[in-house]
């Protein structure tokens, strides 16, 4: 259980509550969650963040009416900057997008600008939005995370409670290595509903070699952990940086979609360009 799971800032969220679906534009449906909720317990404040990054959202169920009432469909790509005051709560995002369904917009650009304006206001930070026509995305292959997968290890695990203990003494030797490690076994749970969130994670670092068994045990320990996607990625970044002390570190997770949305947060303290192709489970 997260230390802030019952924080009053979460009381007003529609997440975990019965809600009515609206199909006419309603910006009031969007809800933000302060990033400080999980950053404060980690000792992170806006002026001392050890990383940069973004939350990348893919919007698969986006539709509206053109000026003549003809339905339009698109796939949206949203990038929410890590410096924003709030992250966007995903159920509220879904409800907000549903409110476009029977709303007329003159142009695609009007839709894009509306999304960008509303998301920036909710997040209190920088947000960029792109809309793709379906034929732009046809024929795109399923992507894969570059790196060495650490999942196929002959180990026994019987503890699924979150702990950083596995990262203690997880580095060895004085030689500096540079490697990219991948796991598809990341599973955490929604902070409010405790529904499972499934993801793949890519960890790229330069520093003393990290023990792969200990790293995998640490990642598996998220299995009963309740936090939002973005919060898990920041926790993983902070824990690896704290215990393993790499010179450079990038952490990037791509989660399976829910409600027509997938969330793909990344955090890095070096030059890092996230690949945005959807993975096999997305």
From Swiss-Prot:
Active-site residues (renumbered): 190 (thioimide intermediate), 197 (proton donor)
InterPro entries: GTP-CH-I_C/QueF (IPR043133), NADPH_dep_7-cyano-7-deazaG_red (IPR050084), QueF (IPR029500), QueF_N (IPR029139), QueF_type2 (IPR016428)
EC number: 1.7.1.13
Function noted in UniProt: Catalyzes the NADPH-dependent reduction of 7-cyano-7-deazaguanine (preQ0) to 7-aminomethyl-7-deazaguanine (preQ1).
Family stated for the protein in its record: Belongs to the GTP cyclohydrolase I family. QueF type 2 subfamily.
Catalytic reaction list: 7-aminomethyl-7-carbaguanine + 2 NADP(+) = 7-cyano-7-deazaguanine + 2 NADPH + 3 H(+)
Molecular function GO labels: preQ1 synthase activity
Protein name: NADPH-dependent 7-cyano-7-deazaguanine reductase
Biological process annotations from GO: queuosine biosynthetic process; tRNA modification
Keywords of this entry: Cytoplasm, NADP, Oxidoreductase, Queuosine biosynthesis
One matching Pfam family: QueF_N
Chief place of localization: cytoplasm
């Amino acid at each position: 259980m997260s230390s802030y799971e019952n924080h009053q800032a979460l009381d007003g969220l529609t997440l975990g509550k019965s809600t009515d679906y609206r199909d006419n534009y309603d910006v009031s449906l969007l809800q933000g969650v302060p990033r400080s909720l999980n950053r404060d317990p980690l000792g992170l404040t806006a002026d001392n963040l050890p990383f940069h990054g973004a939350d990348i959202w893919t919007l698969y169920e986006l539709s509206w009416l053109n000026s003549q009432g003809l339905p339009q469909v698109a796939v949206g790509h949203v990038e929410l900057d890590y410096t924003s005051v709030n992250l966007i709560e995903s159920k509220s995002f879904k409800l907000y997008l549903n409110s476009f369904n029977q709303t007329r917009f003159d142009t695609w650009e009007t839709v894009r600008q509306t999304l960008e304006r509303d998301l920036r206001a909710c997040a209190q930070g920088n947000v960029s939005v792109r809309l793709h026509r379906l034929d732009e995305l046809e024929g795109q292959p399923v992507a894969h995370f570059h790196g060495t997968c650490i999942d196929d290890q002959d180990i026994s695990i019987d503890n699924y409670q979150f702990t950083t203990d596995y990262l203690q003494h997880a580095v060895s030797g004085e030689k500096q290595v540079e490697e990219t490690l991948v796991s598809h076994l990341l599973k955490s749970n929604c902070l409010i509903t405790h529904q499972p969130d499934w993801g793949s994670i890519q960890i790229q670092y330069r520093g003393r070699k990290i023990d792969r068994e200990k790293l995998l045990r640490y990642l598996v320990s998220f299995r009963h952990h309740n936090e939002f996607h973005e919060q898990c990625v920041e926790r993983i970044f902070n824990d690896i940086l704290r215990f393993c002390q790499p010179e450079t570190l990038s952490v990037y997770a791509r989660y399976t979609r829910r409600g027509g949305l997938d969330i793909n947060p990344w955090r890095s303290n070096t030059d890092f360009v996230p690949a945005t192709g959807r993975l096999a489970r997305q």
